[in-house]
Amino acid sequence: MKSNYDVIVVGGGHAGVEAALASARLNKKTALINLYEDKIATMPCNPSVGGPAKGIVVREIDALGGEMAKAADATALQTKLLNSSRGPGVWALRVQSDKEEYSKYMRNVIKNQKNLDLITRACTGLVYDENKTVTGIYLDDQTILNAKAVIITTGTYLKSEILKGVDRYESGPNNEKTTKGISQSLIDLGIKLMRFKTGTPARVYRDSVDLSNAVLEPGTDMKLAFSFSTSTYTPIEKQQPCYLIHSTLETKKIIEDNLEKSAMYSGTVKSIGPRYCPSFEDKAVRFREKDTHQIFIEPETLNGDTWYVQGFSTSMPIEVQEMMLKSLPGFENVRVKHWAYAIEYDCIDPMQLSPSLELKDVKNLFTAGQINGTSGYEEAAGQGLIAGINASRKIDGLDPIILRRDEAYIGVMIDDLINKGVWEPYRLLTSRAEHRLLLRNDNAETRLKQYGKEIGLISDQEWNQYLIYVKEIEQAIKELKEIRFTPKSQLAINLKNKNQADLSHGYSGYEIIKIPTVDINELIEFIPSLQKLKTNQLQSIVIEIRFEGYVKKERQLVDKLVKLERKKIPLDINYSKVDNLATEAKDKLEKIRPLNIGQASRITGVNPADIQMLLFYLKKQYPLENIDN
């Protein structure tokens, strides 16, 4: 076994895979440490990728040169465009994944990646010196692996415990081994740890439930994909269905009668769970006025015999779980393959991180994924990609890649984590992004592909394809502006017959697209440049035209905010000497140590008056430094 690496990644989940691939593809000798070879990028909870905000993150990962989008497209059982009836700022793609094929896909990519070794051992601790500089890791066979940077991506395995009712025992997800030694290393390095909780529902045998009365939830009949490079699509007739059912009054009564047996409500659980993915008993308590709740029945893999009971996670003991399941419509004769459970695990306070995802007080140590207090495969993968990129760039002596809030949901997430911290598992939501009209599902490439190219993760071939992609959009918009349609044109007749528009006079194609009721597909046969475009290109054209004024105002606002990002704060500043700065602001600024005024202004507890005092101090104390660059 080699003992010297540039980058070591500990944990082969969604964050670890992206971190390791990014590092290796940037020509760094990389080791990925994972307990099991066949447990790479597994889906221990929901068998899906994407969703509101999350789906846009997957497209951002792809634009930067990551792998998740390709894997999701290649292993999709169903593809669905969410929120299509609402504004474009919240449109998102979601795929139902074949979890076995997804893991197999990523495993093959890892094994075939140049510069990357997969080591199936446990990491038992970190190697570091008296200056808090991490230099490697310990393995469970006492081997020391040396590295210039270490990335911890342990997910929910860090000192984890499974909870069912009053039963509690050490275990990772699905009764796999837990990881304990790393927590002690982090504590010894002075890193503050927290304890979070999540959970997963039961998996039930398909042939034991009757879904004949359930509501069918099909995919979307459009050519949709996460990855820019995907060119083949699963037709709607070959996509696997999902189903919707509702819990019953009997389900509610069972929970009320047995609430004290739940790990959540018996006092067994001391940690904090996810607000946006609560256990079913938590829903029953928090929303007592509701008699029923939605439950989605989803396939996990074509090779399996189970349904995933989405929305029905619980920490109840097995005998109560069985009663709960049998109270659901069509589940009267249900047989269970895997019971639901809750899991507690260690994570760090992410306010200890710099924007690069390196620990501020520990050199060469990066963290990504659920160890940073987030939830979700997509959030983890986005962080892993950034950590892998920045660990590699640090080795090369390059500045880190820091995405702004107006550039990517990944930027929103990392900015939230390091400036606001977390008190519960963090989930990305469209509402967290103040510039969501700019951070759309359709424009991830135009926002981030340039970064991917400059970083070195986008090939020349893909870059050239992207340039053609952009040129095609520009050409189509140009043609829409030039071509005109009279009230007697065939297009005008078609639009009137379909109640989409009544063209009372001559209109350009551009003006017609501005009409909210017009479907751009009606123009395709009349405008040659539209005929070869992908779905995302057509969506971009419609949004850029129809929301032109809003997008322009949003970009003008962003230009003003970016100026604050350019006002740098010296690393040696002493905040205690800043006059008239509120005590809370001093404490927060000292703890987080923002890199610029823009970041400082987003810290909870730092108000506009504090920012004015800080700017005044900087101009007075650092007159020779150009804080505007």
Swiss-Prot record:
<feature type="binding site">
    <location>
        <begin position="11"/>
        <end position="16"/>
    </location>
    <ligand>
        <name>FAD</name>
    </ligand>
</feature>
<dbReference type="InterPro" id="IPR004416">
    <property type="entry name" value="MnmG"/>
</dbReference>
<comment type="function">
    <text>NAD-binding protein involved in the addition of a carboxymethylaminomethyl (cmnm) group at the wobble position (U34) of certain tRNAs, forming tRNA-cmnm(5)s(2)U34.</text>
</comment>
<comment type="similarity">
    <text>Belongs to the MnmG family.</text>
</comment>
<dbReference type="InterPro" id="IPR036188">
    <property type="entry name" value="FAD/NAD-bd_sf"/>
</dbReference>
<keyword id="KW-0285">Flavoprotein</keyword>
<dbReference type="InterPro" id="IPR049312">
    <property type="entry name" value="GIDA_C_N"/>
</dbReference>
<keyword id="KW-0520">NAD</keyword>
<dbReference type="InterPro" id="IPR040131">
    <property type="entry name" value="MnmG_N"/>
</dbReference>
<dbReference type="InterPro" id="IPR044920">
    <property type="entry name" value="MnmG_C_subdom_sf"/>
</dbReference>
<comment type="subunit">
    <text>Homodimer. Heterotetramer of two MnmE and two MnmG subunits.</text>
</comment>
<dbReference type="Pfam" id="PF21680">
    <property type="entry name" value="GIDA_C_1st"/>
</dbReference>
<dbReference type="GO" id="GO:0050660">
    <property type="term" value="F:flavin adenine dinucleotide binding"/>
</dbReference>
<dbReference type="Pfam" id="PF01134">
    <property type="entry name" value="GIDA"/>
</dbReference>
<keyword id="KW-0274">FAD</keyword>
<dbReference type="InterPro" id="IPR047001">
    <property type="entry name" value="MnmG_C_subdom"/>
</dbReference>
<dbReference type="Pfam" id="PF13932">
    <property type="entry name" value="SAM_GIDA_C"/>
</dbReference>
<dbReference type="InterPro" id="IPR020595">
    <property type="entry name" value="MnmG-rel_CS"/>
</dbReference>
<dbReference type="InterPro" id="IPR026904">
    <property type="entry name" value="MnmG_C"/>
</dbReference>
<dbReference type="GO" id="GO:0030488">
    <property type="term" value="P:tRNA methylation"/>
</dbReference>
<protein>
    <recommendedName>
        <fullName>tRNA uridine 5-carboxymethylaminomethyl modification enzyme MnmG</fullName>
    </recommendedName>
</protein>
<keyword id="KW-0819">tRNA processing</keyword>
<dbReference type="GO" id="GO:0002098">
    <property type="term" value="P:tRNA wobble uridine modification"/>
</dbReference>
<dbReference type="GO" id="GO:0005829">
    <property type="term" value="C:cytosol"/>
</dbReference>
<dbReference type="InterPro" id="IPR002218">
    <property type="entry name" value="MnmG-rel"/>
</dbReference>
<keyword id="KW-0963">Cytoplasm</keyword>
<feature type="binding site">
    <location>
        <begin position="273"/>
        <end position="287"/>
    </location>
    <ligand>
        <name>NAD(+)</name>
    </ligand>
</feature>
